[in-house]
């Protein structure tokens, strides 16, 4: 498959692979494509939050007046308040800084955003909140969002598709449920981490209990309850 095939799909796509699998080379190729906004620690160029958000549109001579409505829309969507705009980027929390990085790139209106292992120093609560914000960005701004991560369990609930990298190549790409349902043994053979929730559903199936494909613990509890209720009512 071509790298271009994963772009402009209006999906959230997870990119995973073992250490040394060649993730970085594949990600580098993605970054070279057109209309890619890259979110990483190199994004920060200014001390003041508002200046940072407007840095790239100034750098590339966008007309700020025409972008004011868009800036307000993005700031509102990302829940960046007025007080935060006047602060130093070095005095805000890591999760707030992450939102500032997104806003500064989003203002340039790229079609695709790539998050290159920047989410995962956050605690669980902050990470979950920000991943939910990415789902809103995808929906309301029609963006393709690519998340490179070391741990599939961190993002499984929030992604639509998955890319699995092995030996410097794209081993598998497609809908997350189909990838794990149709390629479970291959992924195991490659010793690539499988989401805990997928492992649980597979073990239940191996023991004769078929559960719906779900991607979060709340839905798993519901589907287990439905199945067990049916079982005990027989």
Show which residues each predicted segment covers:
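Hydrophobic anchor residue at the start of the ABC signature
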Residues: 102
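H-loop/switch region of ABC-family ATPase nucleotide-binding domains
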Residues: 149-150
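A short, surface-exposed alpha-helical micro-motif characterized by mixed small hydrophobic
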Residues: 155-157
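Conserved beta-strand-loop-alpha-helix hinge in the C-terminal portion
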Residues: 169-193
